[in-house]
Design a protein with these regions (language model features):
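Core hydrophobic alpha-helical transmembrane segments of single-pass membrane proteins
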Residues: 12-13
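Sequence-level preference for short, compositionally simple segments enriched
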Residues: 25-323
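Boundary at the C-terminal end of the N-terminal hydrophobic targeting segment
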Residues: 19-24
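Bacterial N-terminal signal peptides that target proteins for export
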Residues: 1-8, 18
């Protein structure tokens, strides 16, 4: 994790004396004790002006604390950047799970459980923890992303089943910590994980990609490491939520937590013919190319070299968050 920015403290002190009128501001400030403009993250997001742009984003500075609230960056709230004071001490959390009754009295189901929802394009977050504290009770999302061009740096994502849903669009994760046990990184988006720590709490599956057939990439993990909560934990690199699921691990350190076969077919042999699973230069006790399922690939050095942030996330607009 990166050290706390020295600039944050100065900005936070400056924000304490700023009036609540935010129509022309690009910096908003949040603290639980009420010493700044807002006491909740959602209040600050709601106050984001309509004048944001690539050169004039709205930066929301969040003081350390545990913010128990549902957070929603609505579609019109583009170019918003959430900056926490410290990743381990600045926590956005809630505790919904799929079995809980919703307003209609019926179980909420997976997609109504996220603690944080990002519908806006061009969202960024750094030095924050996104958590669903429901525990091992079934599907309970910490984060759902439907916006395009979202970037997360030095963030922590804590949950059990279905921790992160990357539903659509493109996302970039750098230096992040992601914990869970079943399908805890899932969805149909294109996402690049760079220098991230993936932690498996108990037996399960890391990924459950639902990549569309026409989409060249799903989830790419580059220079990451995979660990387990205890030596007895065994997990799979992924299983195909949809037939053309695409997941690639590049130069990733794998502890003994990984099942030797690597991948699971979700009890559907037909998906072995369509799933796009690959590795290159996996290392550690969990890296055993000879033991992997025959329907997953080991890439050549030339193939792996071509899988870059720019190639995976560039799209028609040339987005490159790794700059």
């Amino acid at each position: 994790m990166r050290p706390q920015s020295l600039l944050f403290g100065a900005l936070l002190l400056l924000g304490a004396g700023v009036a609540r009128s935010v129509s022309a501001q690009t910096n908003l400030y949040v603290s639980l004790d009420g010493s700044n403009q807002f006491k909740s993250v959602q209040e600050a997001i709601n106050a984001v002006p309509q004048t944001t742009s690539p050169t004039n984003p709205c930066i929301i500075h969040i003081k350390a604390g545990t913010y128990k609230e549902l957070v929603h960056a609505q579609r019109e709230k583009r170019f918003v950047r959430l900056v926490g004071e410290d990743a381990e001490k600045t926590v956005l959390t809630y505790n919904l799970n799929a079995k809980m009754p919703g307003a209609d009295g019926k179980p909420m189901g997976t997609f109504r459980t996220p603690s944080t929802i990002i519908d806006a394009d061009d969202f960024m977050a750094e030095n924050l923890t996104f958590e669903n504290s429901a525990g091992p009770v079934g599907q309970a999302l910490a984060l759902r992303v439907d916006g395009d061009r979202a970037a997360f740096r030095n963030c922590r994502f804590l949950g059990w089943q279905d921790t992160i849903l990357l539903n659509r669009g493109r996302q970039y994760f750098e230096g992040c910590y992601i914990a869970g046990h079943v399908d805890f990184i899932f969805g149909g988006a294109t996402a690049f994980f760079e220098n991230c720590h993936i932690h498996c709490l108990t037996n399960g599956y890391i990924t459950a990609a639902s990549t569309p057939q026409e989409q060249p990439f799903g989830f790419v993990f580059s220079n990451c490491r995979v660990t387990g909560e205890s030596p007895g934990v065994k997990t799979y690199l992924g299983r195909p939520w949809r037939p053309f699921s695409s997941v690639t691990y590049l130069n990733t350190e794998m502890s003994g937590v990984i099942q030797p076969v690597g991948w699971n077919n979700w009890k559907d042999p037909a998906r072995e013919k369509t799933a796009r699973y690959a590795e290159f230069n996996s290392t550690g006790p969990g890296a055993d190319p000879k033991a992997r399922v025959p329907w997953a690939r080991q890439l050549t050095a030339e193939e792996a070299k071509a899988i870059t942030v720019e190639k995976v996330l560039g799209g028609p607009d040339g987005w490159n968050p790794g700059k």
